[in-house]
Amino acid sequence: MERAISTTPILDQALTCVQSYKALAATVQELASPELQRSIEEGLAQFLTHMPEFNILVNAVEPPHTSWDYLLRNDASQRGEMTMLLMELQCEIDQMAFAIRQAMQQQHPEAEPLSNNSRLVDAWTENLRSVEDHTVWRLAFWRRDHAVHTTYPTTNPLVNQSFYFAIRNELGLDVSTQFRECIRRAITQECPTITARPALHRRLVDLVVQRRRFWNFQRRIRGLSKDAVLWGRDALAPPHFAPGDERFTCPFCFFDLPVAAYRTPRAWTDHVMSDLEGYVCLYETCSSTRSWPETCPHACTSFGAWFTAMAGSFAEGVEWCSHAFACDGRRLEEVHRPRCAAPAVRLDSVCPLCGREPAVEETELRMADAADPLQDDDQNRAKARLLLSHIAGHLEVITPMAFTWNTDRNALDPDRRLFWGDIGSPGGAGGSA
């Protein structure tokens, strides 16, 4: 049986903290003294200004479950620490709300209680600064570091030494090398001309192999047997939902998700690609390197972010930068010169992966976001959209290979076909977990 790693305490604590804040804000509205009410409202406004992450939680459309679970699910030490910090923050808010209620219940309000209450507000604000130092700023740094990352890089680096963090066959032998070679050949089959771009080819292979390692690890720590993690799944077909189901556990990211949001193939593909960070930097000369496990750092969780990075670079000459160099090989000081001194990189009309010129009638044109209407495209942006939409189609075939492959000996046999579902017999290259 699958053994879930629960972050319910931290999610409940975050929600309780938000509810306490809102209760305090509501209590302030009931104060008889306009001066005291204004003083506390200013304190609350300052609180949110200096605590941007809490501001996001308070004003979020959805509960703070998804993003916090996304960051902290794999790290027990961070979960415990964050729970304590949230409890501290909630305690401060609750104490302030209690003090205000006590002041409201006084039978004979006079100037002195008002003065005392004002000093209480000042003391509370000062206390919050210490909480702020330990809590929300730390959250801000975490979210900044992981803003475009999936759960994969948040795993403790010691997992690299785990027996579970390997790609094995039914005999328990590490077949990472064979798996990597199969992926390399499959990518070449999907994109024949990518061999002319060895760095980009290697970047894609690294991403697929890395993600399969993490997926195997995640499945093993949830109780799947060593034989069960041999099998891949069809990653791009939405799961089957039983009538009446409102939520389900994603078999890839293991989040608890609402059924309604993922019924369409497009929404499901977007979710899978988000968890895989499947939209990668296309610059052959990309010099970005980071220590394990972020072997493919220039990757995005959404087509919109990727389109902005890549199309903006080509159309406006503001290159996707990495360390001391831009991804096109120029030094950063060259990139940051006035626009006229930095010639724009122009987008080729031929796909760098397959060598074909994409046709509008064969390509699903994508929007970066709801505020990105196709009809507003000028010539350069329309050209970028067509090519990047075409390339995105390739990436949506390549990166899910991390989920779709079997790793038994038959599946890794170079004489057999390699894509999920191509082999109908048992033990083929595709299967269901």
Curated annotation (Swiss-Prot):
Domain of life of the native organism:
Eukaryota
Q: EC number(s)?
A: 1.-.-.-
Annotated metabolic or biological route of this protein: Secondary metabolite biosynthesis
Keywords of this protein's UniProt record, alphabetized? Oxidoreductase
Question: What one GO molecular function would you report for this record?
Answer: oxidoreductase activity
Job description of the protein: Oxidoreductase; part of the gene cluster that mediates the biosynthesis of aculins. The pathway begins with the synthesis of 6-methylsalicylic acid by the polyketide synthase (PKS) acuA via condensation of acetate and malonate units. The 6-methylsalicylic acid decarboxylase acuB then catalyzes the decarboxylation of 6-methylsalicylic acid to yield m-cresol (also known as 3-methylphenol). These first reactions occur in the cytosol.
Name this protein carries in UniProt: Oxidoreductase acuF
Question: From which source organism is this entry?
Answer: Aspergillus aculeatus (strain ATCC 16872 / CBS 172.66 / WB 5094)
